[in-house]
């Protein structure tokens, strides 16, 4: 039989009472990415507007900022992280989950050697699996390289999008093709696969097909 934890809902977090946690415990959350890469114009005024002569965009550093519509929740999360002695990362058990969590921790200036970091690493949302996961928390820093990998991918995607999108858009506009064209590491190859499939459908020619049952 499972013990039903008591929870008190607050603004942006829950206060939890459960035998699993002997100390004062809070559960908070993000929605989407609370922290994201800054826009090009934040680095240099010449990158505020799309101009071919301003390309390529390669900042000397990469800054992260709180998403404009998520400032309230970030402030709540940041305050809880700062006062916590132990932080349990319970985002999705993959690289992107690590990236979301650690981006918030670093932006909140909540990373400290004086804090203990733990990781809930589970692959199911069944009650028994979640409870077992909390009973067997992993050292949080063991998964930190996943965050570094994901952030590297995030920056690479940003560079491709912020350079390729204006490059193609401006060149096409010079040729009389109006509109804005978004390019990306994943979306552009995927779009081409869709195009290839559509071409195959439109150019399909019926051919006789014989089935030999002998």
Segments from the language model and where they lie:
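Intrinsically disordered, low-complexity regulatory segments
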Residues: 1-162
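Prokaryote-biased recognition of long, low-complexity C-terminal linker/tail segments
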Residues: 153, 157-214
